[in-house]
Structures are given as C-alpha cells and as structure tokens.
C-alpha cells in the first residue's frame, strides 16, 4: 500500500524541467519526424526540377539540330527590269523582223525626200517609190506647186537627152523652173539624167530651181553622163 502511494506521489511530484524528462521517449514505430519529412520533400522537389532542366536542354539541342539539318531558303530570283514603252519590242527583235522581211521579199522601204521650190515659203515631202516614172513625178510636183510646169521634152520614161548639148540648153531655157536633185555624192543634177530606178536609189532631195540658175548645172550633168557612159 505504501509502495503504490509512493509511486503515485513520485509521478505527481513537481520538479524543474519538462515532465517525463527522465524517461526515455518511446520509439514511435515507422513514422518519420518533422525534419525528415521536410528534407524528403525538398529532395523530391529538386529531382523533378533537374529532370525538367535536362529535358529542356535536350529539346533545345534537338531544335538546334533540326535547324542545322533544314536547308536554307533558296535565294529569290532578281527582279526583272521594267519595260519602258509599249509594245515592248527590243531593238534586236526589230532587226530580226527587218531581216526576215527582206529575206521573204516583203515590200520595199519608203524613199522619202524633201521637195523645195525657189521662192516658195514651204517644203514638201514625197515618197519616190509611189511613182513609177518621171511623168508621174512631174504631175505630182505640178499639183504641189501650181507655178511649176514640166514639159514632156524627154524621151523614154521622161528621161532627158543629156548627151545633146543643144537640146539640153533649149530645154532649160524653155522652163521657168527646172527640177533638180542632190545625189549620194552631194552633186546637184538635173532630174532625168538616169533611169528611174537609179534615180530613186540615188536621190536625197529635190529642188525646183529657176531656169537661169539651172543653166550652170547643164555642163556638169553632161560631164557626169559621159563619165557614166
């Protein structure tokens, strides 16, 4: 009886320190302590972060490999030069068209020449290939310049006999205006000294000059005709 009371008094006895400090804390089995639990959680949080970092690094590495493996975009073709004018026909095409036209026997090019008359304040331009003879040219000039009349003193195709000096001088003196032309040599000659096709090819311009001024051309025309003969 006394022993049990002493034990109870001992348990309820006040003393300095935490109660039960002299007793060994019983083992709590397999439960973890607070500090162990915190350390474990920290370790678990670090492991996924490391895994994510490694995954991101792998992804970046893979992307860089893909970019290096992919070919670069092909270079864009240079912009074409803007065509000026319409239709856009270049010079070499024009030359090809002209050569093809000549080879195919197309129409001949026009032979435009300027026509002037002494005392007339204006000029005319005609296409010699529109006419077939000197007579047709004379009629056309008569319509252009009413003051000009060309008599039919010539022979075949309206050609003038430049080999006969007397007839030539009579012809020049009988006309108020005499048709003359500048040939490729730069010499002024009387119209009708050569056959018509040759005249069309050699004539550069026409001039209806006064008969008194054309007298000086007669000897020169005779000399040139003799040299051609």
Curated annotation (Swiss-Prot):
Consequence of changing residue 89 to G: In axr3-3; gain of function. Affects auxin-related developmental processes. Affects photomorphogenesis
Signal peptide: none
Motif EAR-like (transcriptional repression), residue range(s) on this chain: 14-18
Compartments, as annotated in UniProt: Nucleus
Variant or mutagenesis effect after changing residue 121 to S: Suppresses the axr3-1 phenotype
GO terms assigned for molecular function: DNA-binding transcription factor activity; identical protein binding
Induction: By auxin.
The entry's keywords: Auxin signaling pathway, Nucleus, Phosphoprotein, Repressor, Transcription, Transcription regulation
Effect of mutating residue 183 to A: No effect on interaction with ARF7. Loss of interaction with ARF7
Record-level GO BP terms: auxin-activated signaling pathway; positive regulation of leaf senescence; response to auxin
UniProt PTM: Phosphorylated by phytochrome A in vitro.
PROSITE patterns: PB1
Outcome (variant: residue 187 to A): No effect on interaction with ARF7. Loss of interaction with ARF7
Entry-linked InterPro entries: AUX/IAA_dom, AUX_IAA, PB1-like
Domain PB1: 110-211
Any one GO CC term of the record: nucleus
Xref: PANTHER family: AUXIN-RESPONSIVE PROTEIN IAA17 (PTHR31734:SF126)
General function of this protein: Aux/IAA proteins are short-lived transcriptional factors that function as repressors of early auxin response genes at low auxin concentrations. Repression is thought to result from the interaction with auxin response factors (ARFs), proteins that bind to the auxin-responsive promoter element (AuxRE). Formation of heterodimers with ARF proteins may alter their ability to modulate early auxin response genes expression.
Anything else known: Increased auxin response of mutants axr3-1 and axr3-3 may result from an increased stability of AXR3.
Domain statement: The N-terminal half of the protein contains two conserved domains I and II. Domain I includes a slightly degenerated ERF-associated amphiphilic repression (EAR) motif which seems to be involved in the activity of transcriptional repression. Domain II is required for the correct degradation of the protein through the SCF-mediated ubiquitin-proteasome pathway. Interactions between Aux/IAA proteins and auxin response factors (ARFs) occur through their C-terminal dimerization domains III and IV.
Family of this protein: Belongs to the Aux/IAA family.
Record's protein name: Auxin-responsive protein IAA17
Gene from which the chain derives: IAA17
């Amino acid at each position: 009886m006394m022993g049990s009371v002493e034990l109870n008094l001992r348990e309820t006895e006040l003393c300095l320190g935490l109660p039960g400090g002299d007793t060994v804390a019983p083992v709590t089995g397999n439960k973890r302590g607070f500090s162990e639990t915190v350390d474990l959680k920290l370790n678990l949080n670090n492991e996924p972060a490391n895994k994510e970092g490694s995954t991101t690094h792998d992804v970046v590495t893979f992307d860089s490999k893909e970019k290096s493996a992919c070919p670069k975009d092909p270079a864009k073709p240079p912009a074409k030069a803007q065509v000026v004018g319409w239709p856009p026909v270049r010079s070499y095409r024009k030359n090809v068209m002209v050569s093809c036209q000549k080879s195919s026997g197309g129409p001949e090019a026009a032979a435009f020449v300027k026509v002037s008359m002494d005392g007339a304040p204006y000029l005319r331009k005609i296409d010699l290939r529109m006419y077939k003879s000197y007579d047709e040219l004379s009629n056309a000039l008569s319509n252009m310049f009413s003051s000009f009349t060309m008599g039919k003193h010539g022979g075949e195709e309206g050609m003038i006999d430049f080999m006969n000096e007397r007839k030539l001088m009579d012809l020049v003196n009988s006309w108020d205006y005499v048709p003359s032309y500048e040939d490729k040599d730069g010499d002024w000659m009387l119209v009708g000294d050569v056959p018509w096709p040759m005249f069309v090819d050699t004539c550069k311009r026409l001039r209806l000059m006064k008969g008194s001024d054309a007298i000086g051309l007669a000897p020169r025309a005779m000399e040139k005709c003799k040299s051609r003969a």
